[in-house]
Amino acid sequence: MRVNWEEKTEKLVNWLREKTREANASGLLVGLSGGVDSAVVATLIKKAFPEKSLGIIMPCFSNPEDEEDARMIANHLNLKYIVVNLDEPYQALVSSLKNATPHEPEKLALANIKPRLRMTTLYYWAANLNYLVAGTGNRTELEIGYFTKWGDGGVDLLPIGNLTKTEVWEFARYLGLPEKIITKAPSAGLWEGQTDEGEMGFTYKDIDHYLLTGEGSAELVDFVKRMQRKSQHKKRIPEVPML
């Protein structure tokens, strides 16, 4: 079924304005990674608040091309942006943690520090400007829990949280975003050479097809269900015991 992207854009922009007003906030900001999800969200917040929207680029031992792409997106949208380099804070924290750890730290435990430092940075600016933080998670990532708890999952609003990754690509084309950004291999930038699909072992297209139709290989179905089970804790507020 053909999607009416003009209608969806208007609905999302109005929703962003409404939620921002409800929070008595002044505007919106987003972390710009150089990827398609953040590019789409940046477009939406710019449309919602042309003068009170901000992109924040936060390299952290990242691929330099990602920062270039993030700047390109901001310039393409005429979106105000700032760059906060997190190399030194990350290095200092990792050094302290390694010194206190009696064994070799888990790779993912160290990698997840990056999105958590970015979350802290976003909320620093949000508090200073009275803005809300717009997250970049899409439906596919949310369904399988492919995000860092209290990292990229730590946001106020998820404007594309009801769109699969495949739909985000289609939306990006409708919005006229640079083709380089749309065709770029999705990556969380957790370590050098990391890609989402390489880490998962499945393509977003196949995962989306299963999420929308219930059809997929036995291996894919097992992967999705396993990820959903493992990530339930990410989607809940902290539990409180009944006394």
UniProtKB/Swiss-Prot annotation:
GO terms for molecular function: ATP binding; glutaminase activity; metal ion binding; NAD+ synthase (glutamine-hydrolyzing) activity; NAD+ synthase activity. Pfam families: NAD_synthase. One of its GO terms (biological process) is NAD biosynthetic process. It is an enzyme of class 6 (ligase). The keyword Lyase does not apply. Mg(2+) binds at D37, E141. InterPro entries: NAD/GMP_synthase (IPR022310), NAD_synthase (IPR003694), NH(3)-dep_NAD(+)_synth (IPR022926), Rossmann-like_a/b/a_fold (IPR014729). It comes from the Bacteria. Keywords: ATP-binding, Ligase, Magnesium, Metal-binding, NAD, Nucleotide-binding. Pathway: Cofactor biosynthesis; NAD(+) biosynthesis; NAD(+) from deamido-NAD(+) (ammonia route): step 1/1. GO terms for cellular component: cytoplasm. It catalyses: deamido-NAD(+) + NH4(+) + ATP = AMP + diphosphate + NAD(+) + H(+). Catalyzes the ATP-dependent amidation of deamido-NAD to form NAD. Uses ammonia as a nitrogen source. PANTHER family: GLUTAMINE-DEPENDENT NAD(+) SYNTHETASE (PTHR23090:SF9), NH 3 /GLUTAMINE-DEPENDENT NAD + SYNTHETASE (PTHR23090). NCBIfam families: nadE (TIGR00552), PRK13980.1 (NF010587). Homodimer. This is NH(3)-dependent NAD(+) synthetase. It comes from Carboxydothermus hydrogenoformans (strain ATCC BAA-161 / DSM 6008 / Z-2901). The gene is nadE.
